[in-house]
């Protein structure tokens, strides 16, 4: 019985692996490209292993997944394969009318996937957060400034306007431009992320105030099957969650 209960806690990791394998096989056959099988099998395997290690209490689990998945997407898909996996790349492929690269990535990780695993992308796979999580402010030391959250919508609108403008002006060598935008965009994200982390004494300040991807993730997480909820009937009002997330109440800390 003890073995059964121990194994049961790894079911979410197994389901996550099966989900990615289903996506991998489906895209392999529909797109007739072996890359999708290898790509999503690798990502799903890393995610499943990382969440299983996290469940087992291994402190390095999340960093392992971030480096394995985030590093792969940044260096191999982004730099070596020259695919813009940022939000500008999503708009680019969307306007081209093709379901590949960034459009597939966004559909799986940031638009429909969060209905199952919430903001798992932010915690386990984002290559920006991968670097920011090594900074010294793992626990926010200042209250969250809710009004600054509007900046993420500004970033979202600017990225859309930028790519729309490039298409409307029929700029030549657009594919090469998107690659350089990927490099420049990531450099700016890292610089802004580090600056905000030290300014607000919070590693994830960039995620809270500037990240445009949150515009997709924020509404989806409310319907997530794996969303963390506050069970008020079991709350002992220790306020640890409030201190950790600098929130005024336990309910707000888990929202």
Protein language model regions, located:
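Single conserved hydrophobic/aromatic residue that forms the stacking wall/gate
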Residues: 248-255
